[in-house]
Amino acid sequence: MARLVALILAVVVAVAVLDLAQAEEQPQCARRGRSAPHRPHSVTITEFGAVGDGVTLNTVPFQNAVFYLRSFADKGGAQLYVPKGRWLTGSFNLTSHLTLFLEAGAVILGAQEVSQWPVVEPLPSYGQGIDLPGPRHSSLINGQSLTDVVITGNNGIIDGQGLTWWNWFRSNKLNYSRPHLVEFVDSKEIVISNLTFLNSPAWSIHPVYCSNVMVHNITIQTSLDAPLIDGIVPDSCSNVCIEDSSITVSHDAISLKSGWDNYGITFGMPTSDIHIRRVNLQSSLGAALSFGSEMSGGISDVHVDHLHIRGSTKGIFFKTAQGRGGYIRDAVISDVEMEDVGVAIAFTGDWSTHPGDHFDPTALPVISGITLKNMVGKNISVAGVLSGITGDPFTNICLSNINISLADSANSTSWFCSNISGYSELVFPEPCLDLHNPSNSSSCLSLPSYHAVAVA
């Protein structure tokens, strides 16, 4: 009997070890849960005096509701339910173990009065706001040092009503940098799903210093002529999954960042283990997918596949500058369809905006180990513009199985390269000689297959 028990225990342990090993081999998107956690306690925003007429200001009801729900954090968490209606509010903070749920027809509207958007200190990895030196306005929905937060619904809407902010930006009437729509700082286990985000004053979704972030089945839209509106911006984050979403903005649709010049170098928190798949992207004035230019903490271990990019100034854009320091390395982008794009693939080492004059010009970035493969482009103006830094070339840039059909009006020289080295195979039009180095072929990375992974 003792031998039988020992044998059973050995089998159980072996199975557990195998399951753990298989789980660790699965990409981040497969390991994340898709369903919102059960919350044993739920309240409706109307219980706190909110009125969904699109006119009544509901900042205090939202703040009071979250304050009340804090008491349930150690009791299984709670849900704040927002029913159908137009709920005008200023900035408010969330709490841990909370689900913010927007029913179909529910619209959270950002207030137009600047007093409803408090001023907060700049992020330490930036040293200033995105628009101006000094402090910045708090985002509409905020999370600071939180755990286990879900923002979801039945395709409810969060509308920043950003036109007022855009006009202030254009007319140089801002006193502080514009707010974002949703921002989580120093938080973990964040899920954002099944919602539409409209008209952010600046960036739409900004997780910064966060880990275990899941964004799926969302839509982001803004006016295509709005000033510098980004979609999703993972910033000094780890273990991030973005999938099954559609983003249409004026600037970068998805932008990976990690701090700005000496502030980012000193803070030293990289962005890593990023998985992006099955997303539709459009950027009228920027890039569909960008890396940097604020990347001073480093960006690595990025896996992107099954992108559809349309109507964008640039398709995939790696941007940095002298003074940034940091690195972008070990990124694989695969299975991309592009149409009506200005420049399909772009690298630049001259994106020279700095948060002040005190940056170190000797802090040179390292860009290496970037693979782009299995790409098709239609009606593309320029196949690629790849420009590194003199004395600091970008290396191990690998292109494979890429076919780009140029627009009739395209420049007859389809590739422009300088201070770049790498390898290419099965690429049309034929790329620059800088990308014909066979010694780089062994450095090209491969993308793990997602197809055999069961998704919960």
Predicted regions, residues:
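Extracellular/periplasmic carbohydrate-active domains that bind, remodel
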Residues: 2-456
